[in-house]
C-alpha cells in the first residue's frame, strides 16, 4: 500500500499579512482533504543571500538553503502561491528555487526537483490576480523537470477576497483553490500507484 502523498506548501512572499500566504493555506487544506500530508512553511524562516556562484564555490550552500533543500527532497509535491512582481515571479521565490537547484557532492543534478508534482495559485489586488507571475513560475519549474498540473488559479481583488477567518468569500474561488491542492495529492497518488 502506498504512503500518503507528502506536499510542501509555501508562498513566494515573506510579507506579513501576505495574500499569497493566506491563499496557499486554502490550497493546503484541499490537499489534506485529498489525503495528503502537508507541511506548510514560510520563506521568511529561510533567509538566504542572493544566489552567487562565487559564494557557492567558496562556502557551499548557505545553511538555510540546505534546510530548504532537505524539505524539498522529503516531499513529492509542491503547492506554491506565487505573487507577481512586475510581470514575473518574486525575487525571494526565484532565489529559493535557484539555491535548492544546486548540486551538492555526488548527488544527481536537480535532485530536489526529481519526480515532483506542483500546483500553482496566486493572489493580487490587481485585475489579473498575478496571472503573469504564474506563467513565469510554471516555465521555471517545468524547466527543472517538475510536473506542474494544468489547473491554476489567479485571485484578483485579493484585498477584499478573504473573510476574517482567512477563507475566500467567493465559494467558487474557494473550490477552485482547494481543488488544486486536492488534484496535486491525487496526481501524486496516481503516480505512486503506477510505480513511479
Outline where the language-model segments fall.
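A generic structural motif
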Residues: 33-39, 146
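N-terminal beta-loop-helix "entrance" segment that forms/cooperates
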Residues: 43-60, 161-165
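Helix-loop-strand module that forms the ligand-binding subsite of alpha/beta enzymes
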Residues: 60-144
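Glycine-rich phosphate/pyrophosphate-binding loop and the adjoining helix
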Residues: 2-6, 21, 147-196
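Cofactor-binding loop segments of dinucleotide-utilizing enzymes, especially the Rossmann-like FAD-
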Residues: 12, 43, 123-124
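N-terminal beta1-alpha1 ligand-phosphate binding loop
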Residues: 2-35
